[in-house]
């Protein structure tokens, strides 16, 4: 039955995954909600659901654009199933945000094989990875993929090796700028993890 539903890319697949993910996410949020939860809590949780749903579409875009699944939606379905198996992800908003940013980085790294605008793609991927590391520290290890992509595709130009460090500098500047605007609350939040 699942093979017949997800064997081809159809709008019905997105509808099934969207409704099921909304149902399971809603059940999880209602089960975890405090009795005195206000509307801000539910708006924040709905925003996280939209980010999770956007992650599904970014993953589907990556797989279809690069021919990774040969025109079917099994990657979309498997991502949804893994979300259900590891339902503790729903409780940690930092992991959801970090996952979305890492998918954006992987999209840029995979598109590096076209050898068009390589410097921009390396910067974007590094930027998203360093930004994801602010939300979930262990995401920093994905920077190894940037250097592997540089080795595989554009290692001859020495400037490509400097670009990830420029992205690190940019994320650091943005972090400290946002931290100063928010009266050092970001730094204390980051250090308390």
Where are these regions (language model features)?
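Transmembrane-helix signature of polytopic, membrane-embedded enzymes
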Residues: 64-82
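N-terminal membrane topogenic signal
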Residues: 1-20, 69
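Transmembrane-helix motifs of polytopic, lipid-linked glycan transferases
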Residues: 50-66
């Amino acid at each position: 039955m699942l093979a017949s539903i997800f064997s081809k890319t159809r709008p019905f697949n997105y509808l099934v995954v969207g409704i099921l993910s909304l149902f399971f996410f809603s059940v999880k949020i209602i089960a975890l909600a405090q009795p005195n939860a206000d509307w801000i809590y539910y708006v924040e949780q709905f925003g996280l659901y939209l980010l999770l749903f956007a992650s599904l579409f970014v993953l589907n875009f990556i797989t279809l654009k690069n021919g990774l699944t040969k025109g079917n939606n099994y990657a979309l379905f498997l991502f949804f199933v893994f979300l259900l198996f590891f339902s503790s992800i729903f409780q940690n908003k930092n992991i959801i945000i970090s996952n979305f940013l890492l998918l954006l980085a992987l999209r840029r790294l995979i598109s590096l094989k076209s050898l068009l605008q390589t410097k921009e793609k390396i910067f974007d991927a590094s930027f998203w990875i360093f930004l994801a590391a602010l939300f979930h520290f262990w995401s920093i290890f994905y920077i190894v993929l940037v250097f592997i992509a540089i080795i595989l595709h554009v290692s001859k130009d020495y400037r490509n090796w400097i670009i990830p460090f420029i992205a690190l500098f940019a994320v650091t500047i943005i972090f400290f700028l946002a931290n100063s605007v928010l009266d050092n609350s970001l730094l204390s939040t980051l250090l308390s993890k």
